[in-house]
From Swiss-Prot:
The keyword Nucleotide-binding does not apply. Pfam families: Ribosomal_L35p. It comes from Karelsulcia muelleri (strain GWSS) (Sulcia muelleri). Belongs to the bacterial ribosomal protein bL35 family. One of its GO terms (biological process) is translation. Keywords: Ribonucleoprotein, Ribosomal protein. This is Large ribosomal subunit protein bL35. PANTHER family: 54S RIBOSOMAL PROTEIN BL35M (PTHR33343), LARGE RIBOSOMAL SUBUNIT PROTEIN BL35M (PTHR33343:SF1). GO terms for cellular component: cytosolic large ribosomal subunit. It comes from the Bacteria. InterPro entries: Ribosomal_bL35, Ribosomal_bL35-like, Ribosomal_bL35_CS, Ribosomal_bL35_sf. The keyword Ribonucleoprotein applies. GO terms for molecular function: structural constituent of ribosome.
Length: 65
């Protein structure tokens, strides 16, 4: 039998919060930042929660069923 391995991309992108929810970084903050407003860049730097319909798939990728 082979070993089950976690998806390394998911391992780097998601972190768990105490109440069982998952947090993630927002997208659109990597490049082409000169034409974006400071307010928008500041909002994009905050963490966001993963939607409840996606939690099952993320736990599956992290082998947490």
């Amino acid at each position: 039998m082979f070993k089950l391995k976690t998806k390394s991309g998911a391992k780097k992108r998601f972190k768990f919060i105490v109440n069982g929810k998952i947090k993630r970084k927002k997208s659109f903050k990597n490049h082409l930042l000169t034409k974006k407003e400071n307010k928008r860049k500041r909002r994009l730097s905050y963490f966001s929660r993963v939607h409840k319909s996606d939690i099952k798939n993320i736990k599956k990728q992290l082998l947490l069923n």
